[in-house]
């Protein structure tokens, strides 16, 4: 049985359950396009937190997952998979984005299991853990939802990212929204 379930619909539409909206993003502090832009419009305080993290930690965020409260809906967290240094036309190669997606999902898997971060940067770990304390409930109680990450602005063919998601079939189940 697959750990990926596809549905058609708008990922940003309100739901009656706890969920983490996962997206891939750059470490340059720009939620300027795609789902990231839509998240910024809907959850501006979350974007402020993201920008602050990027300004303070930059490329040290690559391959990490940071879970940010939406600040506008207690049932929504935003899972940022840092897969590229820059966004837009300056993003990394498809291979590096897929590799960083795998690393970020591995980091996310650790967060789900322990609700704490372990990396080579103690200050970044403290920030990640501080943000985790702002949520209500346990991370494992949240459904994991995403668009077809990496396939928009980053230009990675969806099957490449899909293969990475399948690697986490023992610990994570994803609902992927298609338009």
UniProtKB/Swiss-Prot annotation:
The keyword ATP-binding does not apply. One of its GO terms (molecular function) is phosphoprotein phosphatase activity. It is an enzyme of class 3 (hydrolase). The keyword Iron does not apply. Substrate binds at residues 9-11, 24-26, 31-36, 149-155. Disulfide bonds: none annotated. InterPro entries: ADP-ribose_metab_enzymes (IPR050892), Macro_dom (IPR002589), Macro_dom-like (IPR043472). GO terms for biological process: peptidyl-glutamate ADP-deribosylation. Keywords: Hydrolase, Protein phosphatase. Pfam families: Macro (PF01661). This is ADP-ribose 1''-phosphate phosphatase. It comes from Candida glabrata (strain ATCC 2001 / BCRC 20586 / JCM 3761 / NBRC 0622 / NRRL Y-65 / CBS 138) (Yeast). The lineage of its organism: Eukaryota, Fungi, Dikarya, Ascomycota, Saccharomycotina. The gene is POA1.
């Amino acid at each position: 049985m697959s750990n990926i379930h596809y549905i058609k619909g708008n990922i940003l539409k309100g739901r009656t359950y706890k969920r983490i909206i996962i997206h891939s993003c750059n470490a340059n502090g720009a939620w300027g396009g795609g789902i990231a832009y839509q998240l910024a419009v809907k959850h501006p305080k979350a974007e402020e937190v993201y920008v602050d993290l990027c300004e303070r930690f930059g490329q040290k965020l690559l391959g990490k997952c940071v879970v940010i409260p939406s600040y506008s809906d207690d049932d929504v967290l935003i899972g940022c998979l840092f897969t590229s240094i820059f966004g837009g036309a300056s993003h990394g190669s498809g291979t590096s984005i897929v590799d960083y997606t795998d690393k970020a999902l591995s980091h996310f898997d650790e967060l789900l299991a322990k609700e704490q971060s372990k990396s080579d940067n103690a200050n970044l770990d403290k920030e990640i853990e501080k943000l985790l304390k702002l949520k209500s409930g346990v991370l494992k109680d949240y459904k994991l939802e995403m668009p077809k990450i990496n396939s928009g602005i980053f230009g990675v063919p969806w099957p490449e990212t899909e293969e990475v998601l399948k690697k986490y079939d023992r610990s994570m189940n994803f609902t992927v929204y298609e338009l």
